[in-house]
C-alpha cells in the first residue's frame, strides 16, 4: 500500500507522547481529543471513513469508529485511548517519552494499551485495501480506566454488526474468552453520637457495621458455595472489604461508619441478581435499624463476560494462534462489545506491566502481533471464508 505514514516506532512514539489520562479526580483527568485526532489523521491516510462521537456525560471524551469497506459482517478491532494516572515519584523514565532499552519499549500506555493502535496501523501497510470484501472497523474508546463510558455508549448506539471483534488488551497474545465482572459499593451506616461513658444514650455505627459485615460474610460464603466455574483459576465470585472508616474520637459514640467493598461475579450471575442478593443479605439490618443503612454504587458496575468457546470464530482464533482460549479475573470492555458481536480479548504485552511504574512492552511481541492482525484481517475481511 502506497501510504504516507510514520514508521512503526514513530507511530508508537507519537501515541505515547499524547497524554490521555482518565481519572475520577477531575484535577488530573484529561480529554482524549488530541489522541483521537491523531488516530483519525493516520486512518484517513489509509482510506478509512472516520466517525468521531462525543461520549455523553463526559468532559471532552470521544470515541472514534473508522470504517474500511462496506457490507455486512467483517472484523472490529477495538482499543481504549486512555491510560491510568502515573506515580510520578516511582517512574525512572518520562512516562510520555517512548524509551527503548533492553529490547523493551517504556512509556505510559505502551502495554495498556495505546500501543495496540500502532500495531494495527503498521499491519495495514501490507494490506491491499482494494481487495477488501467485508468491512474492517477500528474502534477507539474513551474512559475505559474509569467508567467504561466509551464502550457503553458505543454498544448502546452503534448499528454495525461485524462477524467478530478483538479487544487488544495486553494478554501476551493469549486469547481470552471470559472474565469476571465488578460491582463496588459503599455501605453507609448512620448511628447516634453521645458520650462513651453512657452507651445506651447513643447508637454506635461501628457496632452496626460489625453486624452488617457478618451478614456480608454469610453472603460471601453463599456465593462461594453455590456459584462455580472451573474454567477460572479462582472459580467462584469473590468479595473484598477494601476500606472502612468510622468515628472521630475515642470518647464519643460513633455516629457514622462507611465500608467500601467489591464483588467480582462470574459470567452468568447478572448484576440485577447480584444486587438482589446484596440487598437481601442486609435486609435484616434495614428492618432492625430503619433508615440507618444505605447501599450506594461507587462505580458503574461491569457485568461478567463470556464468549462461548464452541463459537466458530473462537475456533478460527485458536487455530491461528495454536492455543486454546483462556479466562482471567480482571475486567475489560468485552461485556459491552459482546453486545454488538462475538468478542475475544487478545493483544500484545503483559497484564503484569499494566498500571505499573516504568510500564513497558517487550519488543518480541512486534513480529507476532503484526502477523496475527494481518491474518485476522485476511480471514474476516479479504478471503471468502
Swiss-Prot record:
Keywords, sorted A to Z: Amino-acid biosynthesis, Arginine biosynthesis, Cobalt, Cytoplasm, Hydrolase, Metal-binding, Zinc
Residues that, per the record, bind Zn(2+) 1: 80, 112, 169
Annotated residues for binding of Zn(2+) 2: 112, 145, 355
Gene Ontology process terms (BP): L-arginine biosynthetic process
EC primary class: hydrolase
PROSITE patterns, A to Z: ARGE_DAPE_CPG2_1, ARGE_DAPE_CPG2_2
A Pfam family this chain is assigned to: M20_dimer
Catalytic site positions: 82, 144 (proton acceptor)
Gene Ontology terms for molecular function: acetylornithine deacetylase activity; zinc ion binding
Pathway given in the UniProt record: Amino-acid biosynthesis; L-arginine biosynthesis; L-ornithine from N(2)-acetyl-L-ornithine (linear): step 1/1
Amino-acid biosynthesis keyword on record: yes
Catalytic activity: N(2)-acetyl-L-ornithine + H2O = L-ornithine + acetate
Main location: cytoplasm
Protein EC: 3.5.1.16
Superkingdom per UniProt: Bacteria
Gene3D superfamilies xrefs: 3.30.70.360, Zn peptidases (3.40.630.10)
Subunit details: Homodimer.
Family to which the UniProt record says this protein belongs: Belongs to the peptidase M20A family. ArgE subfamily.
General function of this protein: Catalyzes the hydrolysis of the amide bond of N(2)-acetylated L-amino acids. Cleaves the acetyl group from N-acetyl-L-ornithine to form L-ornithine, an intermediate in L-arginine biosynthesis pathway, and a branchpoint in the synthesis of polyamines.
Record's protein name: Acetylornithine deacetylase
Amino acid at each position: 500500500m502506497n501510504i504516507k505514514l510514520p514508521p512503526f516506532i514513530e507511530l508508537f512514539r507519537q501515541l505515547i507522547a499524547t497524554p490521555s489520562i482518565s481519572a475520577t479526580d477531575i484535577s488530573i483527568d484529561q480529554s482524549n481529543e488530541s489522541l483521537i485526532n491523531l488516530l483519525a489523521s493516520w486512518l484517513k491516510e489509509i482510506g478509512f471513513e472516520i466517525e468521531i462521537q462525543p461520549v455523553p456525560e463526559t468532559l471532552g471524551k470521544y470515541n472514534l469508529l473508522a470504517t474500511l469497506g462496506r457490507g455486512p459482517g467483517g472484523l472490529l478491532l477495538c482499543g481504549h485511548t486512555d491510560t491510568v494516572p502515573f506515580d510520578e515519584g516511582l517512574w525512572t523514565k518520562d512516562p510520555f517519552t517512548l524509551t527503548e532499552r533492553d529490547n523493551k519499549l517504556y512509556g505510559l500506555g505502551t502495554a495498556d494499551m495505546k500501543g495496540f493502535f500502532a500495531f494495527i496501523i503498521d499491519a495495514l501497510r501490507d494490506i491491499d485495501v482494494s481487495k477488501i470484501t467485508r468491512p474492517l472497523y477500528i474502534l477507539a474508546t474513551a474512559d475505559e480506566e474509569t467508567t467504561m463510558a466509551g464502550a457503553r455508549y458505543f454498544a448502546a448506539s452503534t448499528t454495525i454488526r461485524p462477524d467478530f471483534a478483538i479487544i487488544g488488551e495486553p494478554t501476551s497474545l493469549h486469547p481470552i474468552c471470559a472474565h469476571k465482572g465488578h460491582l463496588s459499593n459503599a455501605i453507609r451506616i448512620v448511628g447516634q453520637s453521645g458520650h462513651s461513658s453512657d452507651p445506651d444514650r447513643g447508637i454506635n455505627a461501628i457496632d452496626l457495621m460489625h453486624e452488617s459485615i457478618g451478614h456480608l460474610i454469610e453472603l460471601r460464603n453463599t456465593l462461594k458455595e453455590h456459584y462455580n466455574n472451573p474454567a477460572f483459576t479462582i472459580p467462584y465470585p469473590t468479595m473484598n472489604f477494601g476500606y472502612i472508616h468510622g468515628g472521630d474520637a475515642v470518647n464519643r459514640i460513633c455516629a457514622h461508619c462507611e465500608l467500601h467493598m467489591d464483588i467480582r461475579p462470574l459470567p452468568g450471575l447478572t448484576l440485577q441478581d447480584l444486587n438482589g442478593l446484596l440487598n437481601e443479605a442486609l435486609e435484616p439490618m434495614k428492618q432492625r435499624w430503619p433508615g440507618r443503612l444505605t447501599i450506594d454504587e461507587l462505580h458503574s458496575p461491569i457485568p461478567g463476560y463470556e464468549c462461548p468457546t464452541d463459537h466458530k470464530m473462537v475456533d478460527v482464533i485458536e487455530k491461528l494462534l495454536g492455543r486454546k482460549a483462556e479466562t482471567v479475573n480482571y475486567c475489560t470492555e468485552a461485556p459491552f462489545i459482546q453486545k454488538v458481536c462475538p468478542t475475544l480479548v487478545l493483544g500484545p504485552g503483559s497484564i503484569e506491566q499494566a498500571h505499573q511504574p516504568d510500564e513497558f512492552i517487550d519488543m518480541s511481541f512486534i513480529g507476532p502481533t503484526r502477523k496475527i492482525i494481518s491474518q485476522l484481517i485476511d480471514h474476516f475481511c479479504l478471503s471468502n471464508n
